[in-house]
Amino acid sequence: TLKLAVGQRGNWDTSVSEIGQRAGIFKKHGLTLEIVYTQGAGETQQAVISGSVDLGVAAGVMGVLSAYSKGAPVRVIGAETTGAGDLYWYVKSDSPIKSLKDTDGKTLAYSTNGSSTHGIVTAFIKQYNLKAKLTSTGGPPGTLTAVMSNQIDVGWAAPPFGLDQLDNKQIRVIATGNDAAVFKGQTVRMLIANADVLKTRKPVVDRYMKAYRETVDYMYANPEALKVYSEWLKITEAKAKRTRDGFFPKASIIPDTITGLDTIVRDAVELKFTATQLTKEQLGELIQIPPR
């Protein structure tokens, strides 16, 4: 048995373990997964560091570098999402805000500290020289409620969440994660393990990654995967397909490489997530992706 903390229940990228378990792929590799869903990467990472879970799915890259630089027992076992086009920021349809430039003095949402959304809004502020107030709002459902009730000016979400509201013109998108130049085409979220777990149960972690890779293949090659996903979330298969095909090219969730590491390490200092650049030795210890 492996215990997992997973940020954002229902995002396509965070659903690999759930879909793989439901499809019997992890079982085939002799694994049972206990999956706990969190409000965001900050919470996921905390659970891994404290040892209350073995692995964390979708930990924000900046949060991971920050925790590791402060001596936290965290290791990277894979890339979880590369590119940030799935994340979007939105306002109520009748909001005067048309773009990020209109957010001075307004509240701009992210999920939790150290998450990919936190990294991206921090980058927005720097890149566009904004004076918005960054506000942690947890997951997409609570964030939408806050936007619709005018507690927050700009909310965040990722499909399939919010697609209905966008279609019904209740909300409109003002930015996506790719509008943050430092995150475009980079690995933004990671698969992480507690350092102790990786040391003492490496063969189990290796098996998890084998099953994970097999599930990613299944999610794009087998039409059954959309059925499993849509039944779990109680959404239509059409919406499941739109989520996958519109926002997640397969390459974006293949776990084999951390893309843009050199830039990420520099940006972590720029955006004040680490005090100094991590060295090659440190990165060698932090990043231990099991080979295919």
Regions found by a protein language model. Give the residues of each.
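Short, glycine-/small- and polar/acidic-enriched structural segments
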Residues: 1-137, 141, 146-149, 153-159, ...
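Predominant activation on well-ordered alpha-helical scaffold segments within soluble catalytic domains
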Residues: 18, 65, 122, 163, ...
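Short, solvent-exposed loop/beta-turn-alpha elements that line the ligand-binding surface or hinge
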Residues: 25-28, 179-184, 249-258
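Pocket-lining segment of extracytoplasmic ligand-binding domains
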Residues: 141-231
